Amino acid sequence: MASVNPFDLLDDDAEDPSQIVASKPLKVVAPVQTAKSGKMPTKPPPPSQAVREARNAPGGGRGAGRGGSYGRGGRGGNNRDSRNNDGPANENGYGGGYRRSEEGDGARRGGPVGGYRGDRRGSYSNGGDSGDSERPRKNYDRHSRTAYGNEDKRDGAGRANWGTTQDDITPVTEESTAVVDKNLTVEKQDGEGEATDAKNETPAEKAEEKPEDKEMTLEEYEKVLEEKKKALQATKVEERKVDTKAFEAMQQLSSKKSNNDEVFIKLGTEKDKRITEREEKTRKSLSINEFLKPADGKSYYRPRGGYQGGREGRGPREGNQRDGGRNLREGGRNQRDGGAAAQAPTPAIGDSAQFPTLGK
């Protein structure tokens, strides 16, 4: 059995693409047809027939725009039938895809036929032993699409432009240099004249220019102060004096008595009465019995002998009695007459035997 060389598919890379194009049969150019005489317009076909013709047209119907000339995934088109999944992997540089054209994309660009190769899973290889999952680099150098570098834009002129670098440097002319030289010579002459004048001045004249110190005696100083005080007193505003002569012609008017004074007097007396009543209430003496009241609201001794039996809690129910504390209540009510004798009398404060004073 003869062995098949698996690397036989790579022989096309060694050939020149121009030779491959020349070896292919040339297309026969169809003769130019002469213009036919005009015919009468025919009746348009029905809509169903027009749809069929559009589908069968070489454009491909719906998929003409998406998959048109290259057929990379269009729904329709001429290249749908040219799919060759079982063909060799180096056809048009795609392992199992669609054909782009008869001559190939590489032939139109002048590049080698073949390019990227990969299996049906989508891996790439550029004729080398790079990894299956690594995409190869492009064969041309990358250039900036904008064609602008990192430098500042200084091109053009006008109001809205930066201008050129030459605009910053003012051109040096002979006239400007001559003007500068003249100014320097004039300044030098002025400086020399001032220096000569300063040398000609004598030290005696310099001493005369110094201000003399003013000296005053004490009497002169006091006179100056008095003059200042007089000037200040003159500036002060004199006090206003009232002339009584202007009021001599005036007459006194009789004032009518009004009832408002009486109303104010009554209101004042009522307030005084309220204050005195409050003071009297506070001064009233309280009876001592109020201080002898037992705490927690318990009953205390009453001279008339009122109700003395206090309520107690319910006792345990015995027999058929609904109210076990009824006997206690009755017993408390019966003690109204003899309650005063049972309790001790209240102490008399005025009795000296009960409250002996110290020192007796």
UniProtKB/Swiss-Prot annotation:
Stored PANTHER family:
HYALURONIC ACID-BINDING PROTEIN 4, RGG REPEATS NUCLEAR RNA BINDING PROTEIN B
Residues annotated as carrying Phosphoserine in the record are: 258
- InterPro entries tied to this protein: HABP4/SERBP1-like (IPR039764), HABP4_PAIRBP1-bd (IPR006861), STM1-like_N (IPR019084)
Q: What is this protein called?
A: RGG repeats nuclear RNA binding protein B
Q: Which molecular function GO terms apply here?
A: mRNA binding
Please note every region of biased composition (Gly residues).
58-77
From the UniProt entry, list the residue stretches annotated as the region Disordered: 1-216, 250-360
GO BP annotations listed: regulation of translation
Gene3D superfamilies to which the protein is assigned, alphabetical: 6.10.140.1040
Q: Which residues carry this modification: N-acetylalanine?
A: 2
Top-rank taxon, per record = Eukaryota
Q: What is its main location?
A: nucleus
The protein's job, in short, is:
Ribosome-binding protein that acts as a regulator of mRNA translation by promoting ribosome inactivation. Binds RNA.
Q: Name one Pfam family in it.
A: Stm1_N
- Name the protein family: Belongs to the SERBP1-HABP4 family.
Q: Where is the composition biased (Basic and acidic residues)?
A: 99-108, 132-157, 184-216, 258-283, 311-336
Feature: compositional bias, Polar residues: 162-176
The places in or outside the cell where this protein is found are: Nucleus; Cytoplasm, Perinuclear region
Return the GO cellular component terms, semicolon-separated. cytosol; nucleus; perinuclear region of cytoplasm; peroxisome
User: Which stretches make up the FF domain?
Assistant: 223-288
Give UniProt keywords alphabetically. Answer: Acetylation, Cytoplasm, Nucleus, Phosphoprotein, RNA-binding, Translation regulation
